[in-house]
């Protein structure tokens, strides 16, 4: 699914109107019918409905919904806020249609003073104040209206996007002036701001309504953002060769685990094997030898000369991919070995966890990273890499994207919607995964999966896309059977086979 900017959304509407062809008012009616259908599926016609409509096309949608609900026997009160005595053409036409229908319980056009209605826990508020065209924080009376609605006990359904939430960048927005919906019915596509963790409290449940906007425009229009879905991943996964052998399935090298952190190397290694690498070698301190041999007998153990830490780089000539960082520690000896390892590596690289933290502490080394390297930071690790703390998720995402462009690297910013920032400035969001995966070791598992895919011959962007999708899918399948509360990283590994099977169906 592509994610268009607010400007592209406007252009998509216009293209649909011009090329379907369909009039703008009929397109608005189409959207209103889809919204009305969802509301009627949730609440019976005994539910009191209060509609708040703004002066633009979002308000026009809301007025059309008010009319359709009233036609279906709902008791509807509608308030149209026309402070500047200027309505969009379609909003004005839907106002006329609503009044002429004569089925609405109450219609009030507000131009100066507003006496808000009493809202009870049984009331459903339809929010059509502002939509995806909003480009600045709400102020004045509209901000006061949002605060009033947020303090009310009523259920709130937002049309397209909660009023006050900006489609993309909310860095300088005012949280108190953004409506908190219980249900958001967004039209055609999710908006970028809906993928940011700090905006989830405004959305409630989120549903995407297909209102049949031009598929031709959607397909042919390049956009910076997209959400990866199952068909996208199926399209880049290769069928397994029936004549494959362990030599043809790739040899992965993992440099992971300091003393006391052998668990990270175990998790990464098991995940690497489960993701289909033909052979996996693990380079770890001497003290980890016994536990590694016992825990992952399928892997080849390679011991560092040091007892407790990574101290010497490894010749990567025999390997098809290298993953480095899980449980590595940040000892200065390890730091020096890390940069030496990066300099001499001849195979594709995945940098994670402590290896990222070491680079953050030695920022000059980042300029020595090879092109197409993969880094998989969580939000705080990304802030350390960027050198500044981000005030919001959007700001952090932009920093990750800028860093990916500057380094010509692939930066996979982990989160609920993990974001793969590409060297060309584009960003792919993952659509799988759940909150149960917020557990120690989950990132180590992801590193193992991506390293395996690189070793198997996938290029960096494909390995990242497939890797994060399968990682999340395995977590979803595990959560379905085990629940989210007790999910651990090992469960993700155990459900990787089912994730692969799902993609083979």
What residue spans do the PLM features occupy?
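Short gly/ser/thr-rich secondary-structure transition/capping motifs
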Residues: 105-113, 139, 164-170, 233-238, ...
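Small-residue (G/A/S/T)-rich helix-start motifs and N-terminal tracts that mark the onset
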Residues: 1-82, 88, 183, 194-349, ...
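Short acidic-hydrophobic sequence patches enriched in Asp/Glu that either
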Residues: 87-90, 141, 176-179, 488-491
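Internal gly/pro-rich beta-alpha loop/helix module
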Residues: 122-124, 129-223
